[in-house]
Amino acid sequence: MIRLLSLVLFFCLSAASQASEKLLVLGDSLSAGYQMPIEKSWPSLLPDALLEHGQDVTVINGSISGDTTGNGLARLPQLLDQHTPDLVLIELGANDGLRGFPPKVITSNLSKMISLIKDSGANVVMMQIRVPPNYGKRYSDMFYDIYPKLAEHQQVQLMPFFLEHVITKPEWMMDDGLHPKPEAQPWIAEFVAQELVKHL
């Protein structure tokens, strides 16, 4: 009898663990915990934030500082095979923009990533990215337009860029003016959680 109860408990726990959805965050330094302990980064805080919204989600942070869309595209197949996520959040493009990469190249890389993710059976959420205005209005506008146009064309969800809110609080930004401090990470985690629960 005890053995039977143990087996029942084992299978119940196994089913519960399998019920947790898996989210892969594919990003750059904005998601990689730049110049801070990784446990303070918003992806590390995200599971608890999602749990507050009633969503049990395992978060895999596949972000690497300095990554471009090309780097993300190159790494994506292995990440999909290794983690088999249910949902992938793409937070890439800032480094492409800072280096002045052609919008056509960025669009192509993002589009290929979306196709790979869809082919794996996972859903996609893409984050809007914006480059600083000192890159010129023409390029900044062309860069910004990549994301809504691609989201509409590929029929994927587009998440607002969290940095547009964070940057309004100077005390939350590092001296480089590009990266959020550890103090901003809990707010970012809650912001992302509120957006993601719409798609989980």
Curated annotation (Swiss-Prot):
Question: What domain of life is recorded for the organism?
Answer: Bacteria
Query: Does Hydrolase count among this protein's keywords?
Result: yes
Q: Identify the PROSITE patterns for this entry.
A: LIPASE_GDSL_SER
Q: Does the keyword Signal apply?
A: yes
Keyword terms, alphabetized: Hydrolase, Signal
**UniProt-listed InterPro entries:** Ester_Hydrolysis_Enzymes, Lipase_GDSL_AS, SGNH_hydro, SGNH_hydro_sf
Question: What GO MF terms are annotated?
Answer: arylesterase activity; lysophospholipase activity
Renumbered to this chain, the signal peptide range is 1-19
Please tell me the species this chain comes from. Answer: Vibrio mimicus
Q: How does it associate, per the subunit comment?
A: Homodimer.
Single Gene Ontology BP term?
lipid metabolic process
Any idea what job this protein has? Answer: Favors the hydrolysis of several arylesters.
Taxonomy of origin reads: Bacteria, Pseudomonadati, Pseudomonadota, Gammaproteobacteria, Vibrionales
Catalytic activity reads:
a phenyl acetate + H2O = a phenol + acetate + H(+)
EC numbers: 3.1.1.2
The protein in question is named Arylesterase
Tell me the impact of changing residue 31 to A. Answer: No loss of activity
> What is the similarity comment for this entry?
Belongs to the 'GDSL' lipolytic enzyme family.
Q: A Pfam family name for this chain?
A: Lipase_GDSL_2
